[in-house]
Amino acid sequence: MGLVVKDISKTFGEKTSKTEVLKDINFEVKDGEFIILNGASGSGKTTLLTILGGLLSQTSGDVVYEGKSLFERHTNKAHLRLNDIGFIFQASHLVPYLKVLDQLTLIGKETGMSSKEAQARAKELLTKIGLEEQLNSYPHMLSGGQQQRVAIMRALMNHPKIVLADEPTASLDASRAQEVVEMIRKQIKANQMIGIMITHDESLFKYADRIVQLYDGKIKNS
């Protein structure tokens, strides 16, 4: 059924100092589809992504997933983020004192997996990205590209229905950036998830099924 963004608007401030950042945003993303959000700085991309992830409330409109408001699927937005959504950010944000395996098993346990289930799932994901020999390594022992690959698998640990990525390759060189985005796309396709990524790097557009352009808080094309 996919994800339907319906008339999402966001205004900051009050009375005379109001700023409308998003203006009646409408688009759909099908299951298994990977789209890129693009637009100049200040066009509303990150604001939109944070609303989709339940990190920020919209002023009006709704986001519908599987026929129901995304924000009503759980008792609170923390449960939404933990169970339905996987986040990938510009920086990996790995916990410095946790080993690679533990970075993932921690998420699994928080979503209700047993220790055995979480370890099995984490090892499966880390093997997919060729890091099965680094399970007991700490983040500082990995390259930047390896750290970001761990962050991607961490985002997929809870079998999310939706993956949101905000400039996940901004700190990587061109070859690593291509590798990371190809990996994100591959996982979205294989698991029929919904993928939405923000990037300014036009060389990465080829990995998207569709580009959604934002301009001044509005959809320019989709």
Swiss-Prot record:
Name the enzyme's class. translocase
EC number in record: 7.6.2.-
Residues spanning the signal sequence: none
What Gene3D superfamilies does the annotation carry? P-loop containing nucleotide triphosphate hydrolases
InterPro entries in the cross-refs: AAA+_ATPase, ABC_transporter-like_ATP-bd, ABC_transpr_LolD-like, MacB-like_ATP-bd, P-loop_NTPase
Q: Where in the cell is it found?
A: Cell membrane
UniProt KW Hydrolase keyword: no
Q: Which domain of life is it from?
A: Bacteria
Q: Which GO terms describe its molecular function?
A: ATP binding; ATP hydrolysis activity; transmembrane transporter activity
Pfam families named among the record's database cross-references:
ABC_tran (PF00005)
What is the recorded membrane topology of this protein? Answer: Peripheral membrane protein
Domain (ABC transporter): give its ranges. Answer: 3-222
Q: Where does ATP bind?
A: G39, A40, S41, G42, S43, G44, K45, T46
List, alphabetically, the GO terms of the cellular component aspect: plasma membrane
Instruction: Name the keywords, alphabetized.
Output: ATP-binding, Cell membrane, Membrane, Nucleotide-binding, Translocase, Transport
Q: Which family does it belong to?
A: Belongs to the ABC transporter superfamily. HrtA family.
**What quaternary arrangement does the UniProt entry report?**
The complex is composed of two ATP-binding proteins (HrtA), two transmembrane proteins (HrtB) and a solute-binding protein.
What is this protein's function? Part of the ABC transporter complex hrt involved in hemin import. Responsible for energy coupling to the transport system.
The entry's protein name is: Putative hemin import ATP-binding protein HrtA
Annotated organism of origin: Staphylococcus epidermidis (strain ATCC 35984 / DSM 28319 / BCRC 17069 / CCUG 31568 / BM 3577 / RP62A)
